[in-house]
From Swiss-Prot:
Stated name of the protein: Protein RST1
Residue stretches spanning the membrane: 250-270, 296-316, 347-367, 479-499, 513-533, 546-566, 943-963, 982-1002, 1123-1143, 1175-1195, 1229-1249, 1277-1297, 1719-1739
Disruption phenotype: Shrunken non viable seeds due to arrested embryo development when homozygous. Alteration in cuticular waxes with elevated amounts of cutin monomers in leaves. Susceptibility to the obligate biotrophic fungus E.cichoracearum and increased resistance to the necrotrophic fungi B.cinerea and A.brassicicola.
Subunit structure: Interacts with CER16/RIPR.
Cellular localisation: Cell membrane; Cytoplasm, Cytosol
Tissue: Expressed in the vasculature of leaves, petioles and hypocotyls, anthers of mature flowers and siliques. Expressed at low levels in roots and stems.
Record organism: Arabidopsis thaliana
InterPro entries: ARM-type_fold, FOCAD/RST1_DUF3730, Focadhesin/RST1
Gene symbol of the encoding locus: RST1
Signal peptide: none
Topology in the lipid bilayer: Multi-pass membrane protein
Region (Disordered): 1374-1393
A GO CC annotation given for this chain: cytosol
The keyword Hydrolase belongs to this UniProt entry's keyword annotation: no
Length: 1841
């Protein structure tokens, strides 16, 4: 600095000229000095600093000039110059400030020029103008001048660039206003004013400056906005006048003015803006538009947004002069619009935002200000024209431009919602709304809301919730504008051609939301009444509906006089009749709302009125209806009108009389009037009620109240009952709906009287009621009769006699005969050896320990030895004669013998030891097993055959859990089966081995497969046809236990699945081999056998054996062929059950048809290729006769057997047996065929009769019995005699030789059964009184033959046959092995269901069980039968009838085409469903009903049911659980699991049917969870497994379901209900979600989404705490929005019902997660959703992805302005700012830079980022006061263009 010292010293000289010269010299030297002494050197810097910091103004002034010259000449760097001047400015004296500011201004202009107008700074703080302003306050004056100079100097470079350069400075100036003193505010105003002045001076370059100032408006504090707007408007008016005058940029300046007005109003009408007086702002904006209009500019349709903002401001305003100002503005706009020359009808409709003004303007008509009323009326007159135009052009689409801003405003949201309502066919939003989400998804009213939901219903729910909150917190209230805006929408919709009525309902709801709306609504009613009365309005029909709104306004006490005053003019005597009648009804409804109106109403309802207006029908009816309403709602008030009630009854007008009777009925109901006293007065007016159905209905409605005092007035009560019965039983007009209503009323009235009283007054009352029910077809009347019948049954049960249980006495001669058979056949005193009657001995001999002593084992050995010796004798004498039929009968008898033997052993062990039941059974069976094996080792062939059968019988009689015994027996029999050299061992061993396989335990898979494999091996390898046939029978037995368990199907366990596959393969091999062998024996082509083989193709592991190897070509033994082929056919017939379970129903039908075709003389019934060979058919006929009953029995159970087939097949058997009896040829085939046909015919007939499905002709039964009698009494071989006797026995149900199906013991016929001549019989013959008498001689005859010792062989067969019948009749008494196993079967059967004949239960039961019951009529219709079943389902007990047969017949009856179907019966109600429900109700009492339910629940049978019955069964899983055993329920749950899994891929169901079935399954599982307890863990595990499988196929819940997706809504509803009832620990574990990764194969993304949705729904219902849902925040909000949209909505719907603290926490957490999430749009959209559903404007918001973000400008700002959310506003805005910076950086940088700087944001967010930034920026600006200044500046610096 030394080199400059001399010159610097001269600057201190107090001489200005010397000082200036010194400064010039210093800077000249700096300019020319070498580098080490230049301006950049230390000495140079110090010299410059010395000059600038001088206290002399002259020195500083010259220094600034010289410094600027250095910079201008590029000697000094610009930044250095700015730095020097800025530093000097900050430390200078105040008098020097202007000098430095001027210098800085000059340098800024130079810098801008050098950068060609593109001078940018990295932050607002570095902006030179900002630095100047920030340095000190004194700079402001000069700074304004420098800014103007900058603009004027640099405008040549482009005004747009100049404005961009100044924008940060302008924003900084504005943003500093709230943080500094008033000078900052003043400076900002002056700065804006200065720039506005520049616009005036540079009119052709003014538009960019205007745009700059408009962009800054959003940062201006509200108290400064008024002045700023006035400045801008004044400047604009100058500019626009000039530009329009010159014709330049007219369009741009026009649009700019509209944008300015819209932008200012957008700020003023924002929800977060506090209500302040904005009159001057509005006046300024109006002035701007007035200038445009004066200049001739056209009305812009963009002004529709201005109107929308004014609508909101008008609704929100409470200040009169502000309201007046807005009205004047609106009036100006509307006039301008209507004066526009280009406005057409379409334009008016397209810009119909003005229609929203209707209700707010009407509301202002109640203002006390005359000026407001005048202005409002002017606006209303113009709006009315728009409204009428819109109502006449409802199909024109409405659009509104949103200008440059995509952000919503309250007005646009309301208008958009109104548009959507207008352009649809109902009041249901086409897209889902937030109201729907809030109040229908998963709520307690979800069932109500399935399907379309109207805005009315949702709004009503919203209003109810509002009042609930209001009750909890008195401070809670809605903003003033909400009900007005709701009214604005509804007011427009009133004019809709089809939705006007719903809109009026909405107005009613709005009145309930805010009591202050009563007067506006009254004015709206008056206005619309006037408007709708005009001819040019197409909605005149709404007038009455609109007037109906008046009474609802009377809820406010102050409104009563106004409402009554409004109605009163319509009650003038000269008024029109219809108007007068309407006024009466309105006044009545007003009284309903508020009792203060009663005096006015009472005056109108005077009795004289009916005389005065006798010719005015409408008025009289209106008066009567009002009287009726008063009596119904307030009986005490009704007493005041009693004379008017009497006048109604005495009227000649039927509707008036009817209403009078109804009014009196309500008074009697309330007991304010005595019924019989009133009846004495008015009964003369009820004499001709049958002439008018309405009158009859009303009188019946009255007469039911006579029940209370009927005993006190018996005569009058009897007359009343006669009237009711006469009307109720009248069928004069069966299809008249009015008479139907009257009859229902009469029957309901009868139900009010005591049953005992009616029985005393009516003879045969029950019979008449039953006849009436069975003769009725109308569904409504049937329902009423059901209720009456149920009441009668309950009464009968309550007064029933207490029957004493007496010792059972045989009820018929047949039973008496059967009871004495053991004593007669084996008398104690005679020596009749067991070996002479071996068959009877097996069934009758019984040895019981009589001298058993504790601790003694002698009795056990004695009894065991007795049975062993008897068995030795029997096996030696019982000849099977290589007859498979005899073998089966012997096996059946041996099973009974083994059961008695075991029972005796167990009883003996009971007396000697105290062991467990299973141990006793095992010990007793082991002893028998040892004895049998010991005897078998050295037995003769005949004995060996029987012993092999005995082993099978022993195992069949054992419990399934006896593994060891059955395994030992199987091993022993397998060894015999494989001894090909011993045929006598092989063939019976094969039969027994199959029987054992059918009774193995579920876990004995290996043993079962070994047995079946052994049978298949011998079937293929044996050369004996008899052995092949026996193996066929054994395989048939084995099929009974194949594919019976389905836990494998529903399990993911590989071994279980493999087990089922093995069973399917084994079944295929069995059917394939049997078909192939039979085909070979047939020697002719047979399509059915070939198709059966094709249905079960061989597997890879099968050894395909050729047909020649399967057949023994050298076998010429005709006897072997007959029984061998019979065995194969029987085996094939036995396999139908397994085939059906395998899902091959067609194969079952084919087998049935094939076997029928093999019966001789059946060719006319079924034709099958290859059946023409007589020899083949004769060989096959024996087996087909024996197999057919088995097949038909199964087909009956699964409904594959038609009624018309019964008579045909029975006829075939009759013809066959008749032919065989007539032809006297001898021969083995003939006698075997005769035996087989008799056994088969009897078994078939017995099966058909016991099932009870198909009635059989009486003559056919008699003819068959006569043929059987001829057979056993004629000169035929003994085996034929045996067949005839077994035919008789089988007809009675004994099922001799049939080990697959057994029939329940027949019930004794009713003691008082009438022996009427009948043509058909249904049910067991022994349960029929007529046939019991007919059969007694037949049984006696067989009994006598069994006593005849002349023919021992015949005696043997007779004794055996009669013993089989005795065993069958005693089957219910001795079916268990031990006393403890006889749980309740015997008790249940012994319950005395003594129901008298005259009772209602018996009459109904007889009508259903007996098709020929006299009361039933012919034919019964389905609806009638269903009603009778429903009645009996409620019966406390049923008579002891054959209910199993009845239900099966009714099940079949509905599917028959000849059954009448009432047209009144709803299609969804089916007789089959009622059969199921009836069975479920009484299955605990009747075993046959339990068996019926067991069959229906079997998976294969269940799959064949119709969809409606499947749904019904699934819905009642809980009921089944109450009656099924534990093991059966386990199997049922496994079946359900299997069905659920298979349902998804089943093509036989439609999507709706699948959904319906799943819904039913959810309902059933819910029932099961209610029935189970925590202790029944096994059930719970099974249920939970079903839930998991159902949940897996549950569709992801959609928040906007289409009409075809409503099934999924129902599914979710039931699923959530079910999950609510599940155990909490399991539920939390099941719904646990660890991560959400779409596309990741390791995770089930869709399943996880459903779990989250389920958890949200449960949280909404309070079943799961919100803390559980909160654990998933981070997982959910880090996913892409498109993947989880529905999940987000579900969570928001749940949070809507949460506490405020939970909502606020979710709001904060969501925006915080957006700061780190790779998908920030998801979190922000979630914030938008949550804000939408929680803010006040929720009723107007549609749930649309495209609008959620844009609506956040309304929803979030509204929510954060709520006092309850103010506590979270600051942290929310802080996190939102952080997220905004992150997303803005991502959106503005290139892809490469974005990856580096914002690595966590996914690239899929790039398209959403601009909109995200815009929304977040707007919210941050709106709440910028919660951000520090530096963040506000960065916020303002963000480019939003």
């Amino acid at each position: 600095m030394a080199s400059y010292a001399t010159l610097l010293e001269k600057t201190r000289v107090p001489q200005p000229s010397i000082q200036r010269f010194a400064v010039i010299s210093v800077f000249s030297k700096l300019r020319s000095a070498p580098e080490q002494f230049g301006s950049e050197a230390e000495a140079g810097r110090e010299a410059i600093s010395f000059c600038l910091t001088s206290e002399s103004i002259t020195v500083v002034d010259q220094s600034v000039h010289e410094l600027c010259r250095l910079v201008s000449d590029s000697v000094l760097d610009l930044s250095r110059g700015l730095l020097e001047l800025q530093s000097a400015l900050e430390g200078c004296d105040s008098k020097l400030v202007s000098l430095f500011v001027k210098g800085l201004g000059f340098l800024i202009r130079i810098g801008y020029e050098r950068n060609n107008g593109n001078w940018k700074f990295n932050s607002t703080e570095n902006h030179p103008f900002v630095r100047i302003q920030s340095s000190r306050v004194e700079t402001q004056t000069e700074l304004l001048h420098q800014v103007s100079l900058f603009v004027m100097h640099n405008r040549r470079l482009g005004m747009v660039g100049v404005c961009e350069f100044l924008e940060p400075f302008l924003n900084f100036t504005i943003l500093r206003i709230p943080l500094s003193d008033s000078s900052s505010s003043l400076f900002a105003r002056e700065l804006i004013s200065s720039m506005a002045s520049l616009c005036c001076s540079s009119r052709h370059e003014a538009l960019p400056i205007f745009r700059l100032l408009m962009r800054c408006l959003k940062y201006i504090p509200g108290n400064n906005l008024e002045v700023i707007v006035k400045i801008l408007v004044d400047a604009y008016t100058v500019v626009v006048r000039d530009l329009v005058g010159t014709g330049l940029e007219v369009t741009e300046v026009h649009l700019l003015g509209v944008q300015l007005v819209d932008g200012v109003l957008f700020l003023c009408a924002s929800p977060h803006v506090q209500t302040t007086e904005q009159e001057s702002v509005i006046e300024s904006l109006k002035h701007l538009l007035a200038v445009q209009k004066d200049l001739g500019l056209a009305y812009s349709h963009d002004l529709s947004l201005v109107v929308l903002s004014l609508v909101f401001m008008l609704a929100k305003s409470t200040v009169e002069h502000e309201q007046l100002c807005i009205l004047k503005f609106l009036l100006f706009l509307l006039k301008w619009k209507t004066e526009s020359e280009n406005l057409s009808v379409k334009d008016a409709a397209g810009s119909s935002v003005e229609s929203l003004l209707l209700f707010p303007i009407t509301a202002l008509m109640s203002s006390p200000s005359k000026s407001i009323k005048v202005a409002a009326s002017k606006v209303l007159s113009i709006v009315e024209n728009f409204l009428v135009t819109v109502s006449n052009a409802p199909k024109i689409e409405v659009h509104t431009s949103k200008g440059d801003s995509p952000l919503s405003r309250v007005g646009s949201v309301v208008f958009r919602f109104m548009q959507q309502l207008w352009h649809q066919n109902d009041y249901t939003p086409s897209t889902s709304s937030f109201l729907r989400v809030a109040y229908t998804n998963g709520s307690e009213k979800q069932e109500t809301y399935l399907g379309p939901v109207t805005w009315n219903s949702l709004l009503r729910e919203h209003a109810e919730r509002f009042w609930d909150k209001k009750k909890l917190s008195a401070s809670f209230c809605l903003s003033q504008e909400i009900p007005i805006l709701l009214g604005a929408v509804a007011g427009v919709m009133v004019m809709h051609p089809s939705l006007g009525a719903d809109a009026i309902g909405s107005l009613t709801i709005i009145g309930g939301i805010d009591s202050k709306m009563s007067v506006p609504l009254l004015l709206a009613v008056l206005y619309f009444s006037n408007l709708l009365s005009r001819t040019n309005v197409p909605c005149q029909s709404l007038l009455s509906k609109l007037l109906g709104l008046l009474p609802s306004l009377a809820a406010q006490q102050v409104m009563i006089p106004l409402v009554v005053q409004t109605i009163t003019p319509m009650l003038r005597k000269d008024a029109k009749g219809l108007l007068y009648a309407t006024a009466i009804r309105l006044l009545c409804q007003t009284w309903v709302v508020n009792d203060r109106a009663f005096s006015s109403l009472q005056e109108v309802l005077r009795p004289q009125g009916f005389i005065e207006y006798i010719s005015e029908r409408h008025i009289c009816i209106s008066m009567a209806a009002s009287i009726h309403d008063v009596c119904k709602r307030h009986p005490d008030r009704g007493v005041d009108l009693i004379l008017s009630v009497q006048a109604c009854i005495e009227s000649q007008n039927c509707p008036v009389r009817a209403l009078g009777f109804q009014s009196l009925s309500h008074l009697c109901e309330a007991d304010v009037i005595d019924f019989y006293t009133a009846w004495d007065v008015i009964k003369k007016h009820a004499q001709h009620i049958k002439l008018d159905p309405l009158l009859a209905y009303s009188v019946c409605h009255l007469l039911k109240w006579g029940a209370m005092d009927a005993e006190a007035y018996p005569e009058d009560a009897e007359n009343v009952l006669n009237i009711l019965w006469e009307i109720g039983s009248s069928m004069q007009k069966p299809h008249d709906s009015q008479w139907t209503k009257a009859r229902v009323s009469a029957i309901v009235a009868l139900g009010q009287y005591e049953v005992s009283f009616m029985e005393n007054k009516f003879s045969d009352f029950n019979k008449n009621c039953t006849y009436l029910l069975f003769s009725e077809t109308n569904a409504e009347i049937l329902n009423a009769l059901e209720d009456l019948s149920i009441k009668i049954m309950i009464h009968e049960h309550s007064v029933r006699r207490r029957y004493v249980r007496e010792k059972k006495v045989p009820g018929s001669k047949i039973e008496k005969l059967l009871d004495v058979i053991p004593q007669v056949i084996f008398p104690a005193g005679k020596e009749i050896k067991t070996g002479e009657l071996p068959g009877a001995a097996l069934l009758c001999l019984s040895y019981n320990p009589r001298d058993v002593k504790f601790g003694s084992s002698r009795s056990f050995h004695d009894v065991h030895f007795q049975y062993e010796e008897a068995f030795r004798v029997v096996v030696k004498s019982l000849q099977l004669s290589r007859n498979i039929s005899l073998a089966l009968i012997s096996l059946q008898s041996l099973k009974a013998f083994m059961r008695r033997w075991m029972r005796a052993n167990i009883l003996s062990i009971d007396a000697t030891t105290k062991e467990l039941s299973s141990d006793k059974t095992s010990k007793a069976t082991n002893n028998i097993m040892k004895s049998l094996v010991h005897m078998a080792e050295e037995a003769l062939p005949r004995c060996a055959e029987n012993i092999a059968l005995a082993l099978g019988a022993l195992c069949a009689a054992l419990p399934a859990a006896s593994h060891n015994i059955k395994a030992s027996a199987s091993k022993f029999l397998l060894s015999w089966l494989l001894e090909h050299e011993h045929e006598h061992r092989q063939w019976t061993a094969g039969i027994s081995l199959g029987l054992i396989s059918s009774s193995l335990h579920v876990t004995d898979h290996k043993q079962k497969f070994q047995n079946i494999s052994g049978l298949l091996e011998v079937l293929c390898s044996s050369k004996s046809t008899l052995v092949k046939g026996a193996c066929g029978v054994g395989l048939g037995f084995s099929c009974q236990d194949l594919l019976t368990r389905t836990e494998a199907s529903a399990s993911s366990d590989i071994d279980s699945d493999s087990y089922r596959n093995q069973e399917e393969r084994l079944l295929g091999r069995i059917v394939r081999l049997l078909s192939s062998i039979l085909h070979g024996f047939l020697h002719t082509p047979c399509d059915i056998l070939e198709s059966l083989s094709a249905l079960f193709p061989p597997g890879e592991e099968d050894n395909v054996i050729g047909l020649p190897q399967l057949l023994d070509e050298s076998s010429d033994d005709f006897d072997d062929d007959t029984w061998g082929i019979a065995g194969l056919i029987i085996g094939l017939g036995m396999s139908v059950g397994a085939i059906y379970r395998a899902g091959k129903k067609d194969a079952v039908v084919k087998i049935k048809n094939l076997i029928v075709s093999w019966i001789p003389y059946a060719d006319s019934l079924k034709q099958t290729s290859g059946s023409n060979s007589k020899v083949s058919v004769r060989l096959f006929s024996v087996g087909s006769c024996l197999a057919l009953p088995i097949v038909i029995t199964f087909c009956q159970k699964v409904e594959l057997f038609d009624a018309h087939e019964v008579d045909d097949i029975i006829g075939c058997f009759k013809d066959l047996i008749s032919e065989l009896l007539i032809v006297r040829k001898s021969g083995a085939l003939r006698k075997r065929l005769l035996m087989a046909s008799c056994i088969g015919a009897g078994d078939l007939l017995g099966s058909v009769l016991n099932e009870g499905i198909h009635p059989v002709k009486i003559e056919s039964v008699k003819e068959l019995l006569e043929l059987f009698k001829k057979c056993y009494s004629g000169l035929y071989p003994p085996v034929a005699h045996f067949g005839g006797m077994l035919g008789v026995v089988n007809v009675l149900g004994a099922g001799a030789g049939n080990l697959v199906y057994s029939h329940p013991r027949p019930r004794a016929p009713p003691a008082s059964s009438e022996e009427n001549e009948i043509s058909y019989v249904s049910g067991p013959l022994l349960s029929n009184a007529y046939f019991t008498q007919q059969l007694t001689p037949v049984v006696q005859e067989i009994f006598l033959i069994a006593q005849n010792t002349k023919d021992r062989q015949l005696q043997h067969y007779a004794a055996w046959a009669i013993s089989i019948l005795r065993t069958y009749m005693r089957s219910g008494e001795s079916s268990s092995l031990s006393n403890e196993n006889q749980s309740d079967d015997s008790d249940r059967n012994s319950i005395s269901h003594n129901v008298p004949e005259h009772t209602m239960v018996m009459k109904l039961a007889q009508g259903l069980t007996n098709p020929s019951f006299p009361l039933a009529g012919s034919p019964l219709n389905i609806g009638t039968m269903a009603s009778a079943l429903r009645c009996l389902s409620h019966a406390p007990r049923l008579p002891n009838l054959d209910w199993g047969a009845t239900i099966r017949r009714l099940m079949k009856q509905e599917t028959q085409t000849d059954v009448t179907q009432s047209g009144d019966v709803p299609k969804e109600i089916t007789l089959r469903e009622e059969c199921f429900k009836f069975s479920l109700a009484h299955a605990s009492e009747f075993d046959e009903l339990l068996a019926f339910l067991d069959e229906l629940s079997e998976l294969s049978r269940f799959k064949a049911l119709e969809e409606s019955l499947q749904s019904c069964l699934l819905c009642h899983l809980g009921g089944l659980m109450r009656i099924f055993s534990g093991s059966r329920m386990n199997k049922l749950f496994d079946d359900v699991s299997c069905f659920v899994v298979s349902l998804s891929s089943d093509q036989t169901y439609s999507c709706d049917q699948k959904s319906s079935l799943r819904v039913s399954c959810w309902k059933g599982l819910s029932q099961c969870l209610e029935e189970t307890s925590l202790e029944s863990s096994e059930y719970v595990t099974k249920i939970e497994k079903c839930i998991e499988l159902l949940f897996a196929v549950l569709p992801v819940a959609s928040q906007s379901p289409r009409a075809d997706q409503m099934g999924s809504v129902k599914e979710w509803s039931e699923a959530v209900t079910c999950l609510q009832k599940s155990h909490r620990d399991w539920l939390y574990k099941f719904l646990q979600v660890s991560n959400l990764e779409p596309g990741n194969e390791k995770t089930n993304f869709q399943g996880d989404l459903k779990k989250i949705q389920a958890k949200a729904k449960l949280a909404k219902l309070g079943s799961v705490p919100f803390s559980e849902l909160g654990k998933l925040k981070a997982i959910i909000l880090n996913c892409e929005e498109s993947d989880i949209w529905d999940v987000l909505i579900e969570i928001v719907a749940a949070l809507h019902h949460a506490e405020g603290g939970i909502k606020r926490q979710w709001l904060i957490d969501a925006v915080e997660i957006s700061c780190v999430s790779s998908h920030p749009s998801t979190a922000i959209i979630f914030v938008g959703l949550l804000s939408s559903i929680c803010c006040e404007y929720m009723p107007f918001l549609n749930l649309d992805r495209s609008t959620v973000l844009s609506d956040m400008s309304v929803t979030v700002t509204s929510l954060l302005s709520d006092p309850s959310y103010e506590v979270v506003t600051e942290p929310f805005i802080s996190f939102l700012w952080t997220s905004l910076e992150r997303v803005y950086s991502f959106a503005t940088e290139s892809d490469a830079n974005a990856r580096l700087s914002s690595q966590q944001i996914a690239q899929s967010e790039r398209d959403k980022a601009p909109m995200l930034v815009k929304v977040m920026h707007y919210i941050c600006v709106a709440f910028r006061d919660h951000l520090p200044l530096e963040k506000q500046l960065r916020l303002a610096s963000m480019d939003m263009s």
